[in-house]
UniProtKB/Swiss-Prot annotation:
The keyword Nucleus applies. Residues 225-270, 282-291 have a biased composition (Pro residues). Sequence repeats lie at residues 87-94, 95-102, 103-110, 111-118, 119-126, 127-134, 135-142. Residues 87-142 are annotated as: 7 X approximate tandem repeats. Residues 1-304, 426-463 are annotated as: Disordered. The gene is fs(1)K10. One of its GO terms (cellular component) is nucleus. Keywords: DNA-binding, Nucleus, Repeat. This is DNA-binding protein K10. Its main location: nucleus. Residues 397-416 bind DNA. Residues 14-50, 142-193 have a biased composition (Low complexity).
Length: 463
């Protein structure tokens, strides 16, 4: 199915070649009633051929206004925020990832006058390089004689594939506003081509050299990358960020309102850092030098696929030997506080009664039931116990002195009696042992005497 716009274009080309003067008059007559219809078709970019355009949710209609291509506008006369450029539908914004070239015919469609997209694009290029004499005819007084510089210097992809938008170089003043809207968009798309279409988020292209339609998004253009309105990674900061830092902070190499490009250059040498990449507005600082630095100069820089060094991935932990210091004192490596031991608990654990004192209190060292205890020792023991009972419950130095004297007297008598008794016991034990030895010797001698007599008798011969 051929759209109404394409049919009108083909019919216009044929009629201009046959009857140039008559076509100029007919074109002037049809120019005013078809002005609004052609502007809407040029803004909508021929969405009738695209089956995907029918499924688009909503397309914001064109509203004529002040042409604004600054940082706050989108080039369509609608003054919106530059950061919200993706809020429109896919069929309206050429830089949207859902945008598909509407001039390309659907699959399986063939026309006699319309060739393949490659032939069509090459035909458009040849027409721009060698314009036909029909295009160089002198315009009428009602027509615009001076096309904008964007038509002469920046041929857009729409001009390559839309004969209507390419050949209508002589416009009336009423048509100039809608034409400049398309030219602003085309100029933005043309300037995006050296940077791999950053608004569509493309890091690579399948056919970068053979793709004349650079405005295609991430679906037909085989392009993919990070989502839009996101700054490039940290390792990709460098000279192409522009004088005002990355992102839409200021007019970068794309001009006002244009999206910032993808990083097409290698990262700068770490040793040659300076105020250039920083910018006057204070952009993010360049990455620090890599870990592998030679003594005489920088070593090989980090490649794009290599992960960043450890010092770029977050805050470093202190060395293992030095624990971190928290607001309440030193902390261990697990994040908890290092608690100092309580000295009171240590004293309670370490402190204990001596084993000697405990044995003296538990075991009575001076029992009275022993055989060496005499009546005198028992009387001294009773006096000592009496004074000890009087000292319990109150403190008396004089009574305590008497207790110590009585205690020393009892201990001396008790130990002397015990030693005397042990000596006597030892003497008796020795005497018993000696007596037992004598008895054994006597018994052994007595038993040996009869044996000797019997032996003597045995040596005497019988008569």
């Amino acid at each position: 199915m051929v759209s109404k716009n394409q049919f009108y274009q083909n019919w216009t080309m044929q009629s201009q070649q046959q009857h140039p003067h008559q076509m100029q008059q007919q074109f002037q007559q049809q120019q005013q009633p078809n002005l609004q219809h052609r502007n809407n078709q040029s803004n909508n970019n021929n969405c009738n051929n695209n089956p995907r355009a029918a499924a688009a949710p909503y397309r914001k209609p064109f509203r004529s206004g002040k042409i604004n291509s600054g940082p706050g506008g989108n080039g369509n006369g609608n003054r919106v925020n530059g950061n919200n450029q993706m809020m429109f539908s896919s069929s309206q914004m050429p830089s949207d990832p859902l945008y598909i070239d509407f001039s390309s015919p659907p699959p399986g469609f063939k026309h006699n006058q319309v060739g393949s997209p490659k032939k069509k694009s090459m035909k458009g290029i040849k027409q721009q390089q060698h314009p036909s004499p029909n295009q160089q005819q002198p315009p009428s007084p009602n027509q615009q004689q001076h096309p904008s510089p964007n038509q002469q210097q920046h041929p857009s992809p729409n001009q390559q594939q839309h004969p209507n938008s390419n050949q209508q170089q002589h416009l009336s003043p009423n048509q100039q506003q809608g034409k400049m809207n398309n030219q602003n968009n085309n100029h933005m798309n043309q300037s995006q081509q050296p940077f791999n279409n950053q608004m569509n988020g493309s890091d690579w292209q399948r056919h970068p050299g053979n793709n004349p339609n650079q405005i295609r998004g991430g679906f037909n253009g085989f392009q993919r990358g990070p989502p839009p309105n996101r700054p490039p990674p940290r390792l990709m900061m460098g000279p192409p960020m522009g004088p005002m830092g990355p992102g839409p902070r200021g007019p970068g190499p794309m001009g006002p309102g244009g999206p910032y490009p993808q990083m097409p250059f290698p990262p700068p040498v770490p040793g040659m850092r300076g105020p250039g990449p920083m910018g006057p507005m204070g952009g993010p600082p360049p990455p620090p030098p890599p870990l592998f630095m030679r003594r005489n100069g920088p070593g090989p820089g980090p490649m794009m696929g290599v992960p960043p060094p450890m010092h770029m991935m977050g805050p470093r932990m202190p060395p293992r030997g030095i624990p971190p210091v928290g607001p309440y004192g030193p902390m261990n490596m697990n994040g908890g506080r290092i608690m100092k031991p309580n000295p009171k608990l240590i004293k309670q654990v370490v402190k204990g009664k001596s084993s000697i004192k405990t044995l003296k209190n538990l075991i009575n060292q001076y029992p009275i039931e022993k055989p060496w205890v005499t009546d005198e020792i028992r009387s001294e023991h009773d006096k000592k116990v009496d004074i000890e009972n009087r000292l319990k419950g109150h403190k008396d130095d004089e009574l305590f002195a008497q207790y110590k004297g009585q205690r020393d007297k009892f201990v001396s008598l008790y130990e002397a009696a015990r030693e005397e008794y042990l000596k006597q016991e030892a003497a008796t034990v020795k005497a018993k042992d000696a007596k037992s030895d004598k008895d054994k010797n006597a018994i052994s001698s007595q038993s040996a005497a009869p044996k000797a007599g019997s032996a003597k008798d045995a040596t005497i011969p019988n008569p």
